[in-house]
Curated annotation (Swiss-Prot):
Domain of life: Eukaryota
Molecular function per GO: growth factor activity; growth hormone receptor binding; hormone activity; metal ion binding
GO biological process: animal organ development; growth hormone receptor signaling pathway; positive regulation of growth; positive regulation of receptor signaling pathway via JAK-STAT; response to nutrient levels
Alphabetical UniProt keywords: Disulfide bond, Hormone, Metal-binding, Phosphoprotein, Secreted, Signal, Zinc
Protein name: Somatotropin
Organism: Hippopotamus amphibius (Hippopotamus)
Encoding gene per record: GH1
Family: Belongs to the somatotropin/prolactin family.
Length: 216
């Protein structure tokens, strides 16, 4: 392996292992650039995990001929679409960093309850063997976003919008067609919401710290 790629991989792993700053005034304080880099890496990892889980579930349980029609039904509707959040990179660039952080936090927090049931639903024969750690990873990203909010809001983040609705828990009755459709829809929303959160964080990081990876 060339020195350049190997160094990048080691750096990424090191950033994933870094703890977040617990207090704004803590010493030594983590630079803002590192906070953003840490958050982006965690969001990318979660988004990829969600995408892999969705694909594996689809391959295992959803007949190929039914996938398109199911994706266009109410089961595929994500309630997060009712939040006035940007739907893509271009819209995200029109919002302030604080707004994007609040939207990211809302998206992450809306899944903290439902994902606790993932490990009860999926078997270890699938990719879901890591599902019992998804909650921990989401909590870690939530903490990172809150650390960024403290930095950008001078240590006193204002109360954000409170979600009046959250996602249902995953259905453990995998022999039911209704349960399969429900879980399929939830996994689709989970993937979409994590993609949004990742996009928001990458937009913020790129416009604050111009770099070659800004093209996405």
């Amino acid at each position: 392996m060339a020195a350049g790629p190997r160094t990048s991989v080691l750096l990424a792993f090191a950033l994933l292992c870094l703890p977040w700053t617990q207090e704004v005034g803590a010493f030594p304080a983590m630079p803002l650039s590192s906070l953003f880099a840490n958050a982006v890496l965690r969001a990318q990892h979660l988004h990829q995990l969600a995408a892999d889980t969705y694909k594996e579930f689809e391959r295992a349980y959803i007949p190929e001929g039914q996938r398109y029609s199911i994706q266009n039904t109410q089961a595929a509707f994500c309630f997060s679409e009712t939040i006035p959040a940007p739907t893509g990179k271009d819209e995200a660039q029109q919002r302030s960093d604080v707004e994007l952080l609040r939207f990211s936090l809302l998206l992450i927090q809306s899944w903290l309850g439902p994902v606790q049931f993932l490990s009860r639903v999926f078997t270890n024969s699938l990719v879901f063997g890591t599902s019992d750690r998804v909650y921990e990873k989401l909590k870690d990203l939530e903490e990172g976003i809150q650390a960024l909010m403290r930095e950008l809001e001078d240590g006193s983040p204002r109360a954000g919008q409170i979600l009046k609705q959250t996602y249902d828990k995953f259905d453990t009755n995998m022999r039911s067609d209704d349960a399969l459709l429900k879980n399929y829809g939830l996994l689709s929303c989970f993937k979409k919401d994590l993609h949004k959160a990742e996009t928001y964080l990458r937009v913020m990081k790129c416009r604050r710290f111009v770099e070659s990876s800004c093209a996405f």
